[in-house]
A protein has these predicted regions:
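Charged/polar low-complexity intrinsically disordered segments, enriched in acidic residues
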Residues: 673-703, 707
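Low-complexity, Pro/Ser/Thr- and charge-rich linker/hinge segments at domain boundaries
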Residues: 660-679
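Residue-level detector of conserved catalytic or cofactor/ligand-binding positions
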Residues: 704-717
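Glycoside hydrolase catalytic-domain context in secreted enzymes
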Residues: 1-624, 639-644, 648
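Terminal connector regions
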Residues: 620-663
Length: 717
């Protein structure tokens, strides 16, 4: 496709029309110039291709497809190779269904566990979100189709999402809410970026030039197209000028008229319109180069992939007394409606019309079952509960399948509590009171409270595990698969412990991010708060030993890297996988920083007795924070701790790294600056120190005698 030639031949009306979709899922064709329409579809956990009337909330039916584990589950695998393989599967499905663009993954940070859409997002940590997102996008796009990362940016709640203003300081934005997008843009080059519904610091994301042009294109070098979230356009011409290319859905003609009127009025230039059209033509050209005829949507094979991802993502939160894995021949009873009808996916635009869903009961023949509770209500049903308790008494082990019904969490609204339904909590407590070998298997999209956690010996977190949820659960429970997932989010003990408790979801359509950079484990670990389960936590049916931490150099300067290696050994009796996590703890400096941050991870598979060496590479960005004075990332000189372990609170080995910055952080002294502030800065001390020495000598004093003066500002002297 000769893009510049086509651009020259297009009329202003065709250009304006081209910048809006032709309907709910297709771009606008320019038939006389040979530009075809291409189709896009949700979503991040499986195809939601709609042949009937389109919608963005999963109301109307879509083609039968495979539902894969949600992003919350996939992130818990801490396995980028697995994420890339999943992406390849999704990309192949897109080709087979003649889809040009898959709308996902979502890269928004889990600011609060209450966000109703958290199941669609990877993590509370931007580094993990970026690495997993880049792997998934690379896999999707390896098939010649596009991936559209979303929702750019700071779309961290469903409450008032169309109008809410996410208000935060520059450092918080660049350090927490943008890095995942930056990583994916630079490492995977997604063909699409979706502008979010919400405002960011007073300006709608779909018309935010700082976000869409200054940061995305100029700073990060993005060359793809920007599409609005469905119905996110407020002012079409402002959006084009800001760097937003495609309005979705289309078909009304309002966008075309708005653009043409703005050009006529001089508020939108032809160059700005041409830039948007050029981006869209490049996108269409890119996704129409690959022949789709050879691609086959093998639903059976893809179901096996869904099972594998679920098995590798499940997190064993607790396992006392060796209750798990279940012994062969033990008399087990499965309790809870989720054992028969699992909660395997989230609601809203990610909803997949599953061709096949497995339940735990069908994969555990001969196991007794009692319903225990109903998912369509929260109140205790005495008859159902009593029958379940009686069945538990008669068994060697009781396995309770519990979690959150779909009505508790979905796109479109946020949760108001971390509690599970009353009837489920009551059932778990009642069963645990009579059966010491009680296992809880959880189906939920985000963190929950567990008032019964001290009363049960084992808890297995599946999240929303897709079509293979039931089969994966049984394989994990009986030890056919060894759990290897790690939590990609902290599980707090109670809602009031969460860092955004006082400001989420905000008020009067404004959400102030008052917690700043202290999100998730950055807050909990810095404040040493008691949590239910920490970030990165996850057990195994075997044990692992960490040893021999080495740094390739002890001092690093600007432009240099350091390699960190550690040896991990499987010290148990069965094969297993361990995710080695690397955290960086900064020295005390000019800015308040989290006590430690994840800067590397690697998942290794080990046979009993086997050892492997794991290597990480750290650079300046690994040590840096975002400095508003510089409008860039900055790493202060000093000694950094390099910590390696099994979670953010299970750190096995620590090394020291000396970083030497190319230049000290600029500082501004004013008449209101204290002597302490001046004297603790090397430049200030060099200037003021000799003056104070002369003053002290003239008065017959030493500097110690005037140390009290450091409490006062310079204006006092």
């Amino acid at each position: 496709m000769d893009i510049e030639k086509i651009l020259q031949q297009m009329t202003p009306e065709e250009k304006a029309d081209f910048c809006s979709g032709s309907d709910f899922w297709h771009t606008q064709p320019v038939e006389r110039l040979g530009v075809p329409a291409v189709m896009m579809s949700d979503g991040p956990s499986g195809l939601r291709k709609q042949d009937e009337q389109g919608d963005h909330l999963g109301i109307n039916e879509s083609i039968p497809a495979v539902c894969f584990p949600s992003s919350a589950a996939v992130a818990s695998s801490f396995d980028t190779a697995l994420a890339e393989k999943l992406g390849e599967t999704l990309g192949n499905e897109c080709r087979a269904e003649n889809l040009a663009l898959l709308l996902g993954p979502g890269l928004n940070i889990k600011r609060s566990p209450l966000c109703g859409r958290n199941f669609e997002y990877f993590s509370e940590d931007p580094y993990l979100s970026g690495e997993m997102g880049a792997a998934l996008v690379n896999g999707i796009q390896s098939n010649g189709v596009g991936s559209c990362i979303k929702h750019f940016a700071a779309n961290n709640q469903e409450t008032d999402r169309m109008v809410s203003d996410s208000v935060m300081d520059e450092r918080t934005l660049h350090e927490i809410y943008l890095p995942a997008f930056e990583t994916v843009v630079k490492k995977a080059k997604p063909l699409g970026v979706m502008a979010a519904y919400n405002k960011l610091n007073g300006t709608h994301c779909s018309e935010n030039k700082e976000l869409l042009t200054d940061i995305l294109r100029k700073r990060w070098g993005y060359e793809g197209m920007v599409v609005t979230d469905w119905g996110a356009v407020k002012d079409r011409a402002k959006g084009i000028a800001a760097g937003q290319d495609l309005e979705m859905p289309g078909g009304s003609g309002r966008g075309t008229n708005s653009i043409l009127s703005a050009i006529k009025a001089g508020t939108l230039s032809e160059e700005e319109l041409n830039a948007a059209v050029r981006n869209l033509l490049r996108f269409v050209d890119s996704v129409t180069k690959t022949e789709n005829a050879s691609a086959v949507f093998d639903r059976d094979a893809d179901y096996r992939m869904a099972v594998s991802v679920a098995e590798n993502s499940a997190v064993l939160l607790k396992n006392e007394k060796g209750v798990l894995p279940l012994a062969k021949g033990c008399k087990a009873v499965f309790l809870g409606e989720f054992a028969q009808h699992p909660r395997y996916q989230g609601g809203g635009s990610s909803h997949v019309n599953s061709a096949k869903v497995s339940c735990a009961l069908e994969h555990a023949p001969g196991v007794a079952y009692a319903q225990g509770y109903r998912t369509d209500e929260d109140t205790v049903d005495p008859a159902l509960e009593q029958a379940a308790v009686a069945a538990a008494v008669d068994a060697d082990v009781a396995v309770i399948f519990a979690g959150l019904p779909e009505r508790y969490e979905s796109e479109g609204y946020d949760r108001t509590t971390l509690a599970m339904p009353e009837n489920q909590n009551h059932l778990i407590a009642a069963v645990a009171a009579v059966q010491p070998n009680t296992v809880v298997v959880l189906h939920n999209g985000s963190a929950i409270e567990m008032p019964w956690v001290n009363d049960v010996p084992a808890v297995l977190e599946l999240y929303l595990a897709g079509d293979g949820a039931g089969e994966a659960a049984v394989n994990l429970l009986y030890g056919a698969v060894n759990p290897s997932g790690k939590l990609a989010e902290t599980f707090p003990r109670r809602l009031s412990d969460t860092p955004a408790y006082l400001s989420f979801p905000g008020e009067r359509e404004t959400s102030v991010y008052s917690e700043g950079v202290f999100v998730g484990y950055r807050y909990y670990d810095t404040t040493e708060a008691d949590v239910l389960f920490p970030f990165g936590h996850g057990l195994s049916y075997t044990t692992f030993e960490y040893s021999v931490l080495r740094l390739s150099r002890s001092t690093v300067r600007e432009g240099e890297e350091v390699q960190v290696t550690v040896t991990v050994k499987n010290t148990g009796a069965v094969a297993g996988k361990e995710t080695v996590q690397l955290y960086v703890a900064p020295p005390k400096g000019e800015r308040h920083r989290p006590v430690r941050e994840l800067k590397g991870f690697a998942k290794v598979s080990l046979q009993p007795g086997e050892s492997k060496e794991v290597q990480f590479t750290l650079d300046k960005r690994s040590l840096a924070y975002y400095e508003p004075e510089l409008h860039d990332f900055y790493a202060e000189s000093g000694t950094y701790q390099i910590c390696v372990g099994a979670s953010s609170r299970d750190l096995r080995l620590t090394g020291l790294l000396e970083w030497q910055a190319a230049q000290p952080l600029p500082v501004h002294f004013t008449a209101a600056s204290t002597l302490k502030q001046v004297m603790t800065h090397p430049v200030g001390a060099a200037i003021i120190g000799p003056i104070l020495q002369r003053m002290a000598a003239a008065a017959g004093l030493s500097l110690i005698h005037i140390s009290e003066a450091t409490r006062h500002s310079l204006i006092s002297y």
